[in-house]
Amino acid sequence: MSSKLRLGVAGPVGSGKTALVEALCRRLRDDLQLAVVTNDIYTQEDAQFLTRAGALDPERIRGVETGGCPHTAIREDCSINRAAVAELEAQFPELDLVLVESGGDNLAASFSPELVDLCIYVIDVAAGDKIPRKGGPGITRSDLLVINKIDLAPQVGADLALMEQDTRRMRGDRPWCFTNLHSGEGLEQVLAFLSQQLPNS
């Protein structure tokens, strides 16, 4: 692993990837040197959102337009993302953490080990309590699974106890957590996971 940590954030459209990246930037930017690469198919929407939200200085945020399958841009041919990361690392050699947010994708999405050191996979309760048991690399092999939007469970009829049971069965000893990123609930668990992974932490 390099002296800086490259962290991938993946998950389906609308699961809360950008919300997680924003929350991590806000909590960590005073203590760590950060940069972000976002992926969108035809726009730079997520990069623009993070800039407007003031998550980081604009020069530390790069938006990548993949122009096609978001999975390909982080796995099979991640050269456009590698170039964006390399550009940020050259501009800011003191970086501690580079966050790479994938475009919204399905449960089969996974990052190339050439691009990131670790991956957080984000799903949301609103997609249904069956999602953890459907499996896929994001569910079973990500370094941390984040189950977001737990506040919506009553509205969508999702059973959090069942999601917990299925998650434990599918992931074994791999870490996971419930979050409500809108309120910040569960964010401390994500931060604790990261603090264990950062070099020199």
Swiss-Prot record:
GO cellular component assignments: cytoplasm
One Gene Ontology term of the molecular function aspect: GTPase activity
One of the GO BP terms on file: urea catabolic process
Binding site for GTP: 11-18
InterPro entries: CobW/HypB/UreG_nucleotide-bd (IPR003495), P-loop_NTPase (IPR027417), UreG (IPR004400)
SUPFAM superfamilies the record matches: P-loop containing nucleoside triphosphate hydrolases
One of the Pfam families matching this protein, by short name: cobW
Keyword vocabulary terms for this entry: Chaperone, Cytoplasm, GTP-binding, Nickel insertion, Nucleotide-binding
GTP-binding is among the record's keywords: yes
Superkingdom as given in the UniProt entry: Bacteria
Function: Facilitates the functional incorporation of the urease nickel metallocenter. This process requires GTP hydrolysis, probably effectuated by UreG.
Protein name according to UniProt: Urease accessory protein UreG
Organism for this UniProt entry: Synechococcus sp. (strain CC9605)
